Amino acid sequence: MTSHRILFATDLPFWRRSTGAEQRIARLVEYLSQSGYCVRIFLLCETTELNQDNSIITEKDQQTIRAQNLDIEFKRSSHPPRQLSKKAAWHLKAIKHHFGSNRTQQHQTSPAQPASQNESLETATPTTLADYRWPWAIDAFADSIRSFAPDSVIIEYVKLSYLLEALTASQRKKIHCLLDTHDVLHLRNKQFQERGLVHWLDISQVEETQAVQLFDTILAIQNEEADVFRNLAPKQNVLVCGHAPLQLPPLKIQPTTSEILTVGYIASANASNLQSLTNFINQSWKPISQRCKIRLVIAGMICDAISTSSPDLFKEHSNIARLGCVSELADFYHQIDVAINPVAFGTGLKIKNCEAIFFGKPLVTTTIGMDGFSAESSESLMVCNSPEDWVDCLVEIAQNPSRQTSLQQAAAKLSQTGFSDQEVYSELDNALRHKK
C-alpha cells in the first residue's frame, strides 16, 4: 500500500525555526514525515532585494534542508504580488516609527500614517489578501498537483487559500484540502487596530469566513479558536492542532544555587511582542531590581527591534542582556531559570509559552498568555496582569528558592505529558487517514 501523500504549501522558511510560526510548522512537517506520510513542500519564495535574509535560500539553508531530508519544491520569482514589496517595507517602518514616537514624544503619532511624509497613501495601506496573490502561483500549484498527485493538501495561513483555485472539480472531490490557520486573523487584526498598531494582514471577518469555507478541514491552534471557526464555517470539519516540541528525555531538576534569578524572554519582532516587552521593562523592571537580585536575558529578533525603537532602554538597566537570534532554543533556555511572557493582546497559541514548559522552565505570563493551556498547567504557571503583579511575583520567586524548585518540577512533569505527539496531533492524524 502506498503512503498517504501530502502537498504542504507555505511561503515561510520554516526550517530556520526563527519564529513561533516557523517552529510550529517545522515540528508539524517533522511529525507527519515520521508518521509515514509522504510530504512534499510547495514553497513560494521571492528573489528580489526585499528582506534578502528571509527570502534568499543560503548554503546554510541547503545544509539544514538536506539534514532534515525535506522534499521542497522551490517556486521562485522576481515578481512579488501586487504592492507587497512596498507594503511590507512600510509595515516594518511603521512598527519602528510607532514605538519610537511613543517613547520620544508627548503626543502619539498615528501609526496608520507612513513613517515618512513623502510616502504615498498607497504605500501606507496595510497588506490584504489580494497582496499575497502571486500571479503565477496558481499555475505552479496546479503543476505540482499533477506531478505529485497528493491525497491531501495542507495550506499554511489563510493568505494562501487562493491556491485551491488550482484544483479542478474532479481533483477537489478526491483531494482532502486542509487549512492550518495559526490564528483567527480577523480578531487578531482588530486587536492590533484597537491599539493603533499595524497588523501584518488587514482582514475582515467576512473575508476570513469566505476563505476558510473553501476547505474541507480547518486546523485551529487551540480549543477556543476552534469554536470560533465552527461558527464561521459550520459545514467544515474543525479540529485542534497545537504545538508539540520534539520530546526531550526526562528533565533533572537541580536545586538552585545562584543568588541571582535569571528570567528570560525570547520572541520575534512583531508589534505585540515589542509593546509587551517595552511596557514590562518601563513599568516593572526597576522596582523588581530594587527588591531582589535578578537579571533579564532577551533573545530572538525582538532584540534588534527594541534596540531600534528604544535605543536608550538597555543603557538604563545594566542587568538586562541581549543574546540576539540563537541557533538552538536550548542555548537560550539553559541560561535562564524562569521564562516570562508579558503579552497584552493577541490570538492563537503562544508558542514561546509551550517551549518554556517543554524545557522545564516555570512560566510567568498573563491571562492572554494562558490561552490554549489546560487547567492542569496551573502548577507550573503564574499569571500577572498588572505591573504590580509582575513585581510581586518575580520578587517572590527570586527570594524563595524552594518555590522556584517546585515550579521547575511542575514544569518538567508537564513537559512530558502536556505536549505529547499523541495529544497534539491525534485529531489531525485521524482526519488525514479517514477523510476522503
Map each language-model feature to its residues:
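Short hydrophobic beta-strand element within catalytic cores of glycosyltransferases
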Residues: 352-355, 362-366
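A charged, aromatic-enriched C-terminal amphipathic alpha-helix characteristic of glycosyltransferases
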Residues: 402-432
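Active-site proximal beta-strand in glycosyltransferases
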Residues: 152-153, 171-190
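Conserved acidic donor-binding segment of nucleotide-sugar-dependent glycosyltransferases
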Residues: 381-388, 396-401
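Acidic donor-binding loop of glycosyltransferase active sites
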Residues: 319, 331-348, 359-361
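Conserved nucleotide-sugar donor-binding subdomain of glycosyltransferases
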Residues: 86-162, 194-212
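Donor nucleotide-sugar binding/catalytic pocket of nucleotide-sugar-dependent glycosyltransferases
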Residues: 209, 213-250
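Conserved catalytic-core segment of nucleotide-activated headgroup transferases in glycan assembly
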Residues: 240-312, 322, 326-330
